[in-house]
Amino acid sequence: MKKGVVIIFVLSLVFMVSCSEKKKDEMSSTQIKKEVTAKDILGNPQYLAISYGGYRERSRDSQPTIPELKEDLKILSAMGVKLLRTYNVQPKLPHASNVLKAIRELKAEDADFEMYVMLGAWIDCLNAWTDKAPNHDVESPNNEGEIERAAALANEYPDIVKIIAVGNEAMVKWATSYYVQPEVILKWVNHLQDLKKEGKLPKDLWITSSDDFSSWGGGSAEYHVEDLEKLVEAVDFISMHTYPYHNSHYNPEFWGVPEAHKDMPDSTKIEMAMERALKFAQKQYDSVTNYMKSLGVNKPIHIGETGWATISNGHYGNNGSRATDEYKQGLYYKSMRRWTNMAGISCFYFEAFNEKWKDAHNAKGSENHFGLFTIEGKAKYPIWDLVDQGIFDGLTRGGNTITKTYNGDKALLLEDVLVPPSEEEIMARR
């Protein structure tokens, strides 16, 4: 009898310890999720990054609904994306705040759902987007409210918002409608950093600005000003943009087919052009790195934007640089992911879905066609393999199942692919 009591006691003790350990494991798992920070996420290939706009109509007046955003988030999550970049928190454009709501709802529905956000705060100069001449030496009075809203959302969603990006291409001088001087970006970055120190923002929230490589010192000397040096010191990391696609028109020296390659098969000419495109992006990345190190600074540098359009009736189309099609997009996407994942660089690939508001009066304008998915939810060539793997099974966009463009017919796709111009042809145009 006593022996039986002892056995029961021992078994009960084992059960209690087991339950206790299980509870500890569950608590530990929960704590790990809560404690994920920007430092953990950035540069981690387990957290693929992407630029995201969920707009489906020709005007941003038509805001995507929460259910539509949740559709998109499920699609992106299925392909391994866990870090989104948004661009503004303007009062009339609740897209970003709705994305945060949608993520929170999905997390409540599924404890394993994981998605984080680099929240953009839009920065303008005085008179931007008006009929008055932009004053690039004075900032817009709207900037203060934009920063306040971004900070408020970071506090409301500390489990989701891990980064605030002050401005989008807000310092680069070709943004003639709205660019500001580096001192404006520095002012707001310092303000947010001060809020962190005062305990008014999460201490692990990272602050940056997302801008062209040249704005981060990788280009001409006109950008090498004291306020940029201070900005490099002030941010937690650098978020730089690089676009070989656009430079196939504006700086095409790398793009043309060399004389020595003229007798190669067209497929080889295209593949080698895309290898040069990757090297172009890497060179711009290295130029920002070199500038940063010349200041005695050593911080992470990640790619806040890069992408490749699939339709263009302008500079990049059949009568231009002939850079535009899904095949080239596929080669670029794969090579960028491969390089950045191996190098420990986050790449906010631009972008998730086509958005037709970007060039609303020109349906075939390249800005409308940077997505990895069409508006209808068709997967473009770069991610056909994911469709084959079945990761989108059961998911829809606008009632459409996720299928391949061109009905998955690569031969049909290749009919739309053009070889880049020769070096001689490019030089003759310049």
Task: State each model region's role.
Residues 34, 89, 94-205, 303:
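Substrate-binding cleft of extracellular glycoside hydrolase catalytic domains
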